[in-house]
């Protein structure tokens, strides 16, 4: 059973990791609303499903109760189970909710590291929510475990056992400044969201479990 659960978590992580890495900014509409365009249409459809008790808005800036239109709801309910599994994230949690223990978070961190880790991914609240959603649906972690120390400088996880820290980085001039996505790329969203105005990126190196930051 453990092997089967690990396989399911691995398959789900591929989809969530893809969303973490592939979401890019879309063009700004005449009224200034920032839209999201996923490099894969299926990923965008997946993100709209969200949690079992709510769905993500198209902007993914916050969780709302029901952003889907009547036709979209009908389309989702008529999908075959196999198709739904192939296309998007689980609509319902796969395990019971619990407060993650130290061992849970250690195992979770090493699992993510083995699957490619979070290194090189710009931090944003949207991406934090995606990681939270994966932990909730596949591992049963109650929301609220992902918290970091304040800046400036390196942000360490407050929850003992989670081994990924956030490092401030300099924004490189590159694709993030392209006309089609510069307003929503995480390298620019992060300074707007961060009280210190820093651009943060998850570190690819796990911190030592005994490291405790106050």
Swiss-Prot record:
Output the Gene Ontology terms for molecular function: GTP binding
N-myristoyl glycine lipid modification positions: 2
Under InterPro entries, the record lists: HIV-1_Nef_core_sf, HIV_Nef
- For the region Acidic, what residue ranges are annotated? 80-86
Q: Does the keyword DNA damage apply?
A: no
Location relative to the cell: Host cell membrane
Q: How does it sit in the membrane?
A: Lipid-anchor
The record's GO CC annotations read: host cell plasma membrane; membrane
Main localization of the protein? host cell
Which key words are in the record? Answer: Host cell membrane, Host membrane, Host-virus interaction, Lipoprotein, Membrane, Myristate, Viral immunoevasion, Virulence
- Keyword Translocase: yes or no? no
Q: Where is this region: Mediates dimerization?
A: 129-145
Annotated region (Disordered), positions in chain: 27-48
Pfam families to which the protein is assigned, alphabetical: F-protein
- Subunit info? Homodimer. Interacts with host CD247/TCRZ; this interaction induces down-regulation of cell surface TCR/CD3 complexes.
Q: What else is known?
A: This is an African mandrill isolate.
Domain characteristics, as noted in the entry: The N-terminal domain is composed of the N-myristoyl glycine and of a cluster of positively charged amino acids. It is required for inner plasma membrane targeting of Nef.
Protein task: Seems to play a role in optimizing the host cell environment for viral replication without causing cell death by apoptosis. Enhances virus infectivity and pathogenicity. Probably involved in viral immune evasion mechanisms.
- Tell me its family: Belongs to the lentivirus primate group Nef protein family.
Q: Per its record, how is this protein called by name?
A: Protein Nef
Natural source organism? Simian immunodeficiency virus (isolate GB1)
The encoding gene is nef
């Amino acid at each position: 059973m453990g092997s089967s659960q690990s396989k399911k978590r691995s398959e789900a992580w591929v989809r969530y990791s893809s969303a973490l890495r592939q979401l890019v900014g879309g063009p700004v509409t005449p009224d200034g609303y920032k839209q999201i365009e996923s490099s894969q249409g299926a990923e965008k459809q997946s993100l709209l499903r969200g949690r079992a008790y709510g769905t993500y808005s198209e902007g993914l800036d916050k969780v709302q109760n029901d952003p889907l239109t009547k036709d979209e709801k009908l389309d989702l309910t008529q999908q075959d189970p196999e198709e739904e599994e192939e296309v998007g994230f689980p609509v319902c949690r796969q395990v019971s909710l619990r407060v993650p223990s130290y061992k849970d978070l250690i195992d979770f961190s090493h699992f993510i590291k083995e699957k490619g880790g979070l290194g090189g991914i710009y931090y944003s609240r949207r991406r934090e929510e995606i990681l939270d959603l994966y932990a909730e649906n596949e591992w049963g972690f109650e929301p609220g475990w992902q918290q970091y120390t304040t800046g400036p400088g390196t942000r360490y996880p407050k929850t003992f056992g989670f081994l990924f820290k956030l490092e401030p980085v300099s924004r490189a001039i590159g694709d993030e400044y392209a006309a089609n996505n510069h307003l929503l790329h995480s390298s620019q969203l992060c300074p707007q969201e961060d009280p210190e105005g820093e651009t943060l990126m998850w570190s690819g190196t796990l911190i030592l479990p005994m490291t405790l930051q106050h």
